[in-house]
């Protein structure tokens, strides 16, 4: 029997230290709900998890971006509806003025209303704003006559670079629709049946222009609706994948924690027994 080195006690102490460390890790995981709390727990798993988290947060923001885009489109469409109603009324008055039974004085009264309605078209265009940005004055329109863009509304609908799309909204002022002269800014004149007749054709083109823009906005909105649904599914699936990597299985971890607690208790008891074994040497010295 030797007394300088108690191998049983040394083994028990080393094993007990390892088990205590395991218990500490069990407690960390159970309290945080995470299998990976630091890089030392799983270096590669942490790297993959953080990359996934970046994508998940990007997708969640992209979904919000797309929903904001839908709101932008809905606001623009609402203003265009008002413009349509005004143009329809001007056309109705033009059809009325084109009838020969009205006198010059009658047409003058009609012209007064037409002038006010044309001014309303410009008011709508100048007041149609989203987050302080004018929507119907050409800010987001294609440049006339060329296949280039003066500006556009970009919607970033992905988690990564260049995953975006843009929408165009044409100029919807009275000048752009031909019901106000671009030079002297005079209003469409319907003081004779001939002028009123020509005005009907101009107004038909204006209505066609608005209808085309509203159809484009409807297509943009439908696309963004599908985009939001797709992004949400992608984010959900990626979140599930990230959870499998990073989150702890609580039931399994609790079983492991219970096992390690028992080992700590038994290890402590055995360390005491190992230390006590050397005390028997004293009986030889008596």
From Swiss-Prot:
Alphabetical list of PANTHER family matching this protein: FLAGELLIN
One cellular component term from this protein's GO annotations in UniProt: periplasmic flagellum
Organism of this sequence: Treponema pallidum (strain Nichols)
Name of the protein: Flagellin FlaB2
Gene for this chain: flaB2
Keywords: Bacterial flagellum, Periplasm
Domain of life where this protein originates: Bacteria
Quaternary structure annotation from Swiss-Prot or TrEMBL: The flagellum consists of an outer layer composed of repeating units of FlaA around a core that contains several antigenically related polypeptides. Interacts with FliW; a synthetic peptide of FlaB1 (residues 229-247) partially blocks binding of this protein to FliW.
Subcellular localization: Periplasmic flagellum; Periplasm
One MF annotation (Gene Ontology) recorded for this entry: structural molecule activity
Purpose of the protein: Component of the core of the flagella.
Membership in a protein family: Belongs to the bacterial flagellin family.
Keyword Nucleus: no
């Amino acid at each position: 029997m030797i007394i300088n080195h108690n191998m049983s006690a040394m083994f028990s102490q080393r094993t007990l230290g390892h088990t205590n460390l395991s218990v500490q890790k069990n407690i960390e995981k159970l309290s945080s709900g995470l299998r990976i709390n630091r890089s030392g727990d799983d270096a590669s798993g942490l790297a993959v998890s953080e990359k996934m988290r970046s994508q998940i947060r990007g997708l969640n923001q992209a979904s919000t971006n797309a929903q904001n885009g839908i709101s932008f489109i809905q606001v623009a469409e609402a203003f265009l509806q008002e413009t349509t109603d005004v143009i329809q009324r001007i056309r109705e008055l033009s059809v009325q003025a084109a009838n020969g039974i009205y006198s010059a004085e009658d047409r003058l009264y009609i012209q007064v209303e037409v002038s006010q309605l044309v001014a309303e078209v410009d008011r709508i265009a100048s007041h149609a704003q989203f987050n302080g940005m004018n929507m119907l004055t050409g800010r987001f329109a294609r440049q006339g006559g060329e296949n280039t863009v003066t500006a556009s509304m970009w919607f970033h609908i992905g988690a990564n670079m260049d995953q975006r799309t843009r929408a165009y909204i044409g100029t919807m002022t009275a000048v752009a629709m031909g019901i106000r002269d671009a030079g002297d800014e005079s209003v469409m004149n319907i003081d004779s049946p001939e002028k009123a007749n020509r005005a009907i054709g101009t107004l038909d083109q204006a209505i066609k222009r608005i209808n085309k823009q509203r159809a484009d906005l409807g297509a943009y909105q439908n696309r963004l609706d599908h985009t939001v649904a797709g992004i949400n599914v992608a984010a959900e699936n990626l979140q599930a994948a990230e959870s499998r990597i990073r989150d702890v299985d609580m039931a399994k971890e609790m079983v492991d924690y219970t096992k390690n607690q028992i080992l700590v208790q038994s290890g402590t008891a055995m360390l005491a027994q190992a230390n006590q074994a050397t005390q028997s040497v004293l009986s030889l010295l008596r």
